[in-house]
């Protein structure tokens, strides 16, 4: 693994960990039980994704709270319809970003497929 690949895997792991916290916080502010369950399920999936990257990096990272603070605020400000579009775009962009890692790190393909 090159130094650049390692840095990219670390960035990806950090992003997935940040998403876990973000989805957990969103689950606390949504209005319906169905939305709450959906966000908790997404948090669980993002945790699995982070563990895939952790298997390669062997680094213990902590989630950063920035998005976990901003997204519930945006939920209240923009409403769920607009916010969900932003979240979906972020997930799709992440999937595209993982494509070039698959050749060297095959487990990343499962993460990429989940993100779409």
Q: At which residue positions do the language-model features occur?
A:
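Non-heme di-metal
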Residues: 1-116
């Amino acid at each position: 693994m090159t130094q650049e690949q390692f840095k990219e895997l670390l960035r990806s792991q950090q992003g997935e960990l940040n998403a876990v916290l973000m989805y957990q916080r969103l689950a606390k502010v949504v209005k319906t039980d169905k939305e709450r369950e959906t966000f908790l399920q997404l948090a669980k999936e993002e945790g699995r994704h982070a563990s895939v990257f952790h298997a390669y990096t062997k680094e213990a990272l902590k989630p950063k709270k920035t998005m976990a603070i901003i997204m519930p605020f945006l939920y209240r400000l923009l409403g769920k319809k607009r916010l969900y579009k932003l979240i979906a775009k972020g997930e799709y962009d992440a999937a595209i970003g993982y494509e070039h890692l698959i050749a060297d790190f095959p487990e990343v393909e499962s993460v990429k497929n989940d993100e779409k």
